[in-house]
A protein has these predicted regions:
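Solvent-exposed interaction patches of small proteins and small membrane subunits
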Residues: 1, 21-23, 61-64, 102
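N-terminal first-folded block
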Residues: 2-51
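Acidic, metal-binding active-site segment of PIN/NYN-like and related structure-specific nucleases
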Residues: 46-63
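Mid-chain, well-packed structural core segment of small domains
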Residues: 60-93
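Charged phosphate-binding loop/patch that engages nucleotide di/tri-phosphates or the phosphate backbone
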Residues: 96-117
């Protein structure tokens, strides 16, 4: 079963949504200190076979994080509470539809999600 690692920039509402969908979830703060670098977050996710969930668009750069190099990354494109709620609707749909996250980058906004393998 897929398990998720929530970046510290992501709201607790997102944590609850993923957990309520039946998936194991950890926050980066459960594992290490506040202010962990992107590199530290990435290494932890890979070593523990976790899918990263973040608002950090840097994780969407396939030159730095090629899809085949990770267990999965979900980048949420939310800019305020309203857009976050819309992203949650799309994220909930993604979690119901998708079964394979390894090696895939998902970009989630308030209207749709895109995936790159």
């Amino acid at each position: 079963m897929a398990a998720f690692l929530i970046d510290e920039c992501v709201s607790f509402q997102t944590y609850r949504l993923i957990s309520a969908s039946g998936f194991p979830v950890k926050t980066i703060l459960d594992i290490t200190h506040s202010g962990a670098t992107d590199s530290e977050l990435f290494k932890i996710a890979q070593s523990q076979t976790l899918i990263i969930v973040t608002l950090d668009s840097g994780f969407g750069d396939v030159r730095i994080y090629p899809p085949k190099s990770h267990n999965g990354i979900i980048v949420l494109k939310a800019f305020d509470l309203n857009s976050l709620q819309k992203c949650h609707t799309v994220l909930e749909m993604l979690l119901k539809i998708e079964s394979e996250f390894k090696g895939t980058l998902f970009i989630v906004d308030g209207n749709k999600y895109r995936k790159k393998k």
